[in-house]
Amino acid sequence: MSHFVKIYDTCIGCTQCVRACPTDVLEMIPWDRCKAKQIASAPRTEDCVGCKRCESACPTDFLSVRVYLGRETTRSMGLAY
């Protein structure tokens, strides 16, 4: 099943989500709009197993990384198939 991983611009570049991911879905990329000058990116979403460890590791008040699982993706994102 395919999962959607969304990185929000509230990311502070701490790398906690990248280190928490057991399948190496996330990586940090350069980004000038935060103090750390980097932001999480999800280039390998096909490897996401939906464990949501990245969400649990995120220290921001509003989770900067969210994983939407299968049917949850269509409801949360307002999409219809």
UniProtKB/Swiss-Prot annotation:
The membrane topology of this protein is: Peripheral membrane protein
Positions of the 4Fe-4S ferredoxin-type domain: 2-31, 39-68
Q: Which InterPro entries does this UniProt record tie to the protein?
A: 4Fe4S_Fe-S-bd, 4Fe4S_Fe_S_CS, PSI_iron-sulfur_center, PSI_PsaC
Q: In which compartments does the protein localize?
A: Plastid thylakoid membrane
Question: Which cysteines are cross-linked by disulfides?
Answer: none
Q: Which PANTHER family match?
A: PHOTOSYSTEM I IRON-SULFUR CENTER, PHOTOSYSTEM I IRON-SULFUR CENTER-RELATED
Q: What does this protein do?
A: Apoprotein for the two 4Fe-4S centers FA and FB of photosystem I (PSI); essential for photochemical activity. FB is the terminal electron acceptor of PSI, donating electrons to ferredoxin. The C-terminus interacts with PsaA/B/D and helps assemble the protein into the PSI complex. Required for binding of PsaD and PsaE to PSI. PSI is a plastocyanin-ferredoxin oxidoreductase, converting photonic excitation into a charge separation, which transfers an electron from the donor P700 chlorophyll pair to the spectroscopically characterized acceptors A0, A1, FX, FA and FB in turn.
Q: What is this protein called?
A: Photosystem I iron-sulfur center
Gene transcribed to yield this protein: psaC
